[in-house]
Amino acid sequence: FHIALSVIEMRSNDGVIPEPLSSEQLPDKAIMLADAALTAALAVAVRQVYGDNPVDCRLAVIAMGKCGAKELNYISDVDVVFVAEPAESKATRVASEFIKVGCRAFFDVDAALRPEGKRGALVRTLESHVTYYRRWAHTWEFQALLKHRPMTGCLPLGEAYSAALSPMVWEASKRDSFVSDVQAMRRRVLETVPDHLKHRELKLGVGGLRDVEFAVQLLQLVHGRSDESLRQLATVDALAALIGAGYVGRTDGASLIECYEFLRLLEHRLQLQKVKRTHTLPEDSDTQTLRWLAHASGFSGEKHRSSIDLMEETLRKVRLNISSLHSKLFYRPLLDSVVNMSVDELKLSPDAAKEQLRALGYNYPDRAFEHLTALAAGASRKAKIQAM
């Protein structure tokens, strides 16, 4: 595993070998390795619990987060959820051993995204999962399910889990407090970043990776009810789908993708340098590490400006751009995302369209619907195309 991971790391670093991996190839290679490694971990766990005895349960491992979305970094934790039939003591022991083996040999395996978090049962039946999400799940838990995929174990059971829960994900925007819940979750994430780290935080801070991800996920959850093309796992794929369907303007969308991929590049390079999971830039005084990061990320010094200066200037622009676009898409009533699409194009009845406007944060959806219908009817085809 570690040899294979080292090969992926070397092949993703321009200048190390003649044929480096592209940014599109890297996640595919990493996820193939992760799935294979964790399938092996599950086989070891089953052997430890059952020995030579027949296996009397079905256990599916559901990948969540970056692993579920096939967006793994070089050094990532792997979020998982377990579903078993029956969910008895041996299934729980297998899941527990799977986590131990995975953590010792491969990745930090984390099952905290399961129903009720760390206080909840490690393993549940499919029926128990469905009951939980129908009755007690919070909005953020449906948001987390955007990234789920059956990874290993009993894949038919994993597919049944997906078939049962996916419809609930795409109905989540009907919840009365949906928009405010998602926005509050983003604010809580920001509050976890210490003041002295805010300017160095690539992932959680203002203008960071999470700003892009939250904006994209909000749009997916709102518009994905009626548009299945938006039901993508990876952030960049989802953003491309939002652009293609007209929910995000082409210029804004292309800019977000470029900025997001730049931050991901810095994150990848940081992990290569430190050989650990991190998304925090070096301290300003650590010029040696900053210089390495700048060079590894493709920056070369100029006559009057160092590679560090150029990297930091680019990073400032990226953060400002992400922050501006995040506010436009995430905190304002999303008129810009809806106005280009008529009710017929959205394939919604008037009542369903008003319901969607309510989910978007409009206090008077009936009035907003009237304005949008008038705008859509009055806009020429040429004007719509030019606005995209």
Spans of features found by a protein language model:
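A nucleotide- and high-energy phosphate-metabolite-utilizing enzyme signature
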Residues: F1-M388
